[in-house]
Design a protein with these regions (language model features):
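Bacterial signal peptide processing site
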Residues: 41-45
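Alpha-helical transmembrane segments
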Residues: 30-34
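N-terminal export leaders
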Residues: 19-24, 28
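C-terminal motif of bacterial Sec signal peptides marking the signal peptidase cleavage site
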Residues: 36-39
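Acidic, low-complexity Ser/Thr/Gly/Pro-rich repeat segments typical of extracellular/periplasmic
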Residues: 263-366
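Functional surface patches built around histidine and acidic residues
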Residues: 2-6, 13, 21, 48-288, ...
Length: 366
């Protein structure tokens, strides 16, 4: 199975991110699963795939988001249930269910279906097949063009996003693609963000092009809804911080996969192990005093690199997310222990907090 993936930018932090677009080919791993991960910044558009056929006129520019409301005083209640989605085929339903299973297991609120964002995500999945181009950025005049960037496409279909991410995968069935996405660094940061309340999912399939099964997931909150989006704090976390892999997780993959750009560019991305991570709400900057991964049975410390917003070479990491990336693939059938000692600083108030976590997980057989 080949899985090709690309992570999108945050609409709220695009100014500090680089734009990286293109078609990233899968590279085989020892598990016979090819995983290519790419992260692209700069939500305002950029290059994209070409395409044949008659050009279609671009849609009108989206209506600007309304002015921000006063700062919220506290988090909204986490969405522990959401309505059953309508209109999904088996693959999109599998992606929706798996995405929410991941968030719930990490102590985060679920994401509700947005039919407007579904249309935007589906249009972009169809655009990638029509133009055989795997990128977040559409080009005006190409077949199926609906907007240069994902926030513009969402707005065209009637949804004004505030913050959030678009993550994408290709060449696989949607449920498995979500599992591959959460095994990366940048993709995981988007999936485990506290702030989003809505999701739109698009998925298409064609055997005639290289981008054969594009999955598009837009994750955000509404800029026109003062109860669930604009002016509201993030969904509350039942755990205070979201760790991954979760405590007691089994069959954790051994490798990070071919994430592009490489979060640890000093070595080949395929030589990196599955990261451990901690996420907090978006207005907090998280830092580590100690972040250590050991083999539980022997106590052997695993050589690893901490990646956070303070040292991310690709300028893609949100300040609220920190990862520990092993310098080598994890060992099969092995239990690992993680210890995180750190803290947070709120961007607006300067209030500090303590985040101490310890947990364990077990790896897959191969």
């Amino acid at each position: 199975m080949d899985v090709l993936m690309e992570a999108g930018s945050s609409a709220g932090h695009a100014a500090r991110r680089r734009t990286l677009f293109g078609l990233f080919r899968a590279v085989a791993t020892a598990t016979a699963v090819s995983v290519a991960l790419g992260a692209c910044g700069g939500g305002g558009g950029g290059g994209g795939g070409g395409g044949g056929g008659s050009p279609e006129p671009p849609p009108p520019a989206p209506t600007p988001a309304p002015a921000p409301s006063p700062a919220p005083t506290g988090p909204i209640a986490a969405q522990m249930t959401v309505p059953t989605p309508v209109g999904y085929d088996a693959d999109r339903l599998a992606a929706f269910n798996r995405l929410n299973e991941i968030r719930l297991s990490a102590g985060l609120g679920m994401l509700a279906q947005s039919t407007a964002m579904d249309q935007a995500a589906q249009a972009h999945a169809d655009w990638m097949i029509a133009n055989d181009s795997f990128t977040h950025a559409e080009t005006a005049g190409t077949v199926g063009f609906t907007g240069e960037s994902w926030p513009r496409r969402d707005a065209v279909f009637g949804y004004t996003p505030i913050g959030g991410e678009e993550v994408m995968a290709a060449s696989g069935h949607a449920g498995a693609e979500v599992d591959a996405l959460v095994n990366g660094v940048y993709h995981r940061a988007g999936i485990l963000a506290f702030e989003p309340v809505d999701v739109g999912i698009g998925w298409s399939a064609s055997s005639a092009v290289d981008v054969s099964m594009p999955l598009v997931i837009d994750i955000t909150r509404p800029g026109t809804d003062t109860t669930r989006g604009l002016g509201q704090a993030p969904q509350a976390s039942t755990h205070g911080a979201a760790i991954w892999p979760i405590d007691g997780a089994r069959n954790v993959p051994l490798r990070l996969g071919a994430e592009i750009p490489n979060p640890v560019p000093s070595q080949n991305v395929l030589s990196l192990g599955t990261p451990a991570s901690v996420a907090v709400e978006e207005e907090a900057t998280i830092s580590a005093t100690a972040f250590v991964l050991t083999k539980s049975e022997t106590g052997e410390v695993v050589p690893a690199q901490i990646v956070s917003s303070s040292n991310d070479p690709n300028l893609l990491m949100p300040r609220s997310f920190i990862a520990l990336v092993p310098r080598a693939p994890l060992s099969p059938n092995t239990t690992y222990s993680v210890v995180f000692v750190g803290g947070t600083v709120e961007a607006v108030t300067g209030v500090t907090g303590v985040v101490n976590r310890s947990w364990s997980f077990s790896t897959a057989a191969q």
